């Protein structure tokens, strides 16, 4: 099966065999082979050869191609949404919104490109001080499995608009979505070599990340893999590296008047996408006392009634399967480990069907437990009770991560205090943690990434500034510097 796209041609991989099944029922979806190191090299060389003409084409012409890609996405929205839903296990309604977001990224990227990396000029005596931006050249995009369309698209679109050529290495858990997406790029008329697709797992990733022909790498995924890439790129200031990674995100709840409103926002924060968003709440901080007891009881009641099902089930489920049986096994083990460390199960996460990756939401009180500073990437929420807001902030900040944090409170004063004292790239007030504006930068600090590689500021990583002093004519200065005689 032809699963690679190199120099405008679909090719069979020479690497290890790959297969993808639906995580909800193990139905076969896709087969192919990974790219070998030689094929990765061929993809990078083709991208390098295609880069000069693509960069010289000009933004207006490049934008026409990218807009045609957007038109193909719109035409095939239903088809691509079904691919994403089957491959990830997420409900069809959610996969459909993912494709819609991919289309919307085009106009946002054009606006960001103009604002963040456009051209500026100012008079400077008899000359002009001009700021322009140039593309890096060949960049790799490493995509994640949780949003296999939207998240790599968030790097590919601005990178192409800026004039780069791109090598796309998707997660080995979502090869089908990547293949279908690249087909749309080819249909849109992207010149041969400007985008390449190399499938594969670790070996493919190592070959691509270590290739001398790369000018940059944009990564979305786990903190462990991101840290390895950061180490690999150390001492290489000639290469741009963007890292968007995970988080052990805290959400602080105060004694709000609208209890069900807060419960809803916690549900959306912790369990949307089966808890497989990097901004999902992992630690819920609830005040001690009767109000907190009642709030937790209501949360457990609502979470226990959430509909879990296959992507196309009717009525539609709120959450579907996690990405794989291995992921489900790891989450169930994490739940057991938290209990063994002193946690109290409030709502036990369980597997709905043996051999399938559909999990019900889990909630564990870990107030008295030894809590590992890890991201449990799934529908598993820890509840931690706090005595006062000082303690809440201390607990919230007790993490090496720094992606998202938030406060559900009727007090603006408490939110302002948390905003000031928190260390995170996304800080929300009375909104789910998983909510973010496409017109804002996205990313984290600490173990969550190197600042803002995604969303509106992605443009910053796709081109570098060039400062120029320009004068239409050459003339001898009226006054010479001391020591010069002409």
Curated annotation (Swiss-Prot):
Class of enzymatic activity (EC top level): oxidoreductase
Catalysis: reaction(s): N-succinyl-L-glutamate 5-semialdehyde + NAD(+) + H2O = N-succinyl-L-glutamate + NADH + 2 H(+)
Gene Ontology biological process: arginine catabolic process to glutamate; arginine catabolic process to succinate
Keyword field contains Nucleus: no
A GO term, aspect molecular function: succinylglutamate-semialdehyde dehydrogenase activity
Keyword tags: Arginine metabolism, NAD, Oxidoreductase
Pathways involved: Amino-acid degradation; L-arginine degradation via AST pathway; L-glutamate and succinate from L-arginine: step 4/5
EC number: 1.2.1.71
Catalytic residues identified in the record: 244, 278
Domain of life: Bacteria
Oxidoreductase as UniProt keyword: yes
Residues involved in NAD(+) binding: 221-226
HAMAP family hit by this protein: Aldedh_AstD (MF_01174)
NCBIfam families: arg_catab_astD, PRK09457.1
Protein role: Catalyzes the NAD-dependent reduction of succinylglutamate semialdehyde into succinylglutamate.
Family: Belongs to the aldehyde dehydrogenase family. AstD subfamily.
Protein name: N-succinylglutamate 5-semialdehyde dehydrogenase
């Amino acid at each position: 099966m032809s699963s690679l796209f190199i120099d405008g041609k679909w090719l069979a991989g020479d690497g290890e065999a790959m297969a993808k099944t639906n995580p909800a029922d193990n139905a076969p979806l896709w087969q192919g082979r990974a790219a070998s190191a030689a094929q990765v090299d061929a993809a990078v060389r083709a991208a390098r050869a295609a880069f000069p003409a693509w960069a010289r084409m000009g933004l207006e012409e490049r934008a026409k191609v990218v807009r045609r890609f957007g038109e193909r996405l719109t035409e095939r929205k239903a088809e691509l949404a079904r691919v994403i839903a089957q491959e990830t296990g997420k409900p069809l309604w959610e996969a459909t919104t993912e494709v819609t977001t991919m289309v919307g990224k085009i106009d946002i990227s054009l606006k960001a490109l103009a604002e963040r990396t456009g051209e500026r000029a100012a008079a400077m005596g008899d000359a002009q001080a001009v700021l322009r931006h140039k593309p890096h050249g060949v960049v790799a995009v490493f995509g994640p499995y949780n949003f296999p369309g939207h998240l790599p698209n968030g790097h590919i679109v601005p990178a192409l608009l800026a004039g780069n050529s791109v090598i796309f290495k998707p997660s080995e858990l979502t090869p089908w979505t990547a293949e279908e997406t690249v087909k749309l790029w080819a249909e849109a008329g992207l010149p041969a070599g400007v985008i390449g697709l190399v499938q594969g797992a670790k070996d493919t990733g190592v070959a691509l990340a270590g290739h001398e022909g790369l000018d940059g790498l944009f990564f979305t995924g786990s903190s462990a893999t991101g840290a390895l890439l950061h180490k690999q790129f150390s001492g290489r200031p000639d290469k741009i590296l963007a890292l968007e990674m995970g988080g052990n995100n805290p959400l602080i709840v105060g004694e709000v008047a609208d209890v069900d409103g807060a419960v809803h926002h916690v549900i959306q924060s912790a369990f949307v996408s089966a808890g497989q968003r990097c901004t999902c709440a992992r630690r819920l901080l609830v005040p001690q006392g009767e109000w907190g007891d009642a709030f937790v009881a209501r949360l457990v009641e609502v979470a226990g009634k959430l509909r879990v099902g296959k992507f196309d089930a009717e009525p539609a489920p709120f959450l579907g399967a996690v990405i794989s049986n291995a992921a489900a096994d790891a989450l169930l083990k994490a739940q057991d480990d938290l209990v063994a460390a002193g946690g109290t199960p409030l709502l036990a996460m369980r597997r709905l069907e043996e051999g399938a990756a559909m999990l019900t939401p889990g909630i564990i009180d870990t107030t008295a437990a030894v809590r590992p500073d890890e991201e449990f990437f799934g529908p598993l929420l820890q509840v931690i009770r706090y005595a006062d807001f000082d303690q809440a902030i201390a607990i919230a900040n007790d993490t090496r991560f720094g992606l998202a944090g938030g406060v559900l409170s009727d007090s603006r004063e408490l939110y302002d205090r948390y905003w000031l004292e928190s260390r995170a790239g996304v800080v929300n007030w009375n909104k789910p943690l998983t909510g973010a504006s496409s017109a804002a930068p996205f990313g984290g600090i600490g173990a969550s990434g190197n600042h803002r590689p995604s969303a509106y500021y992605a443009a910053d990583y796709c081109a570098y500034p060039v400062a120029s002093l320009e004068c239409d004519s050459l003339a001898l200065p009226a006054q010479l510097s001391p020591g010069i005689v002409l």
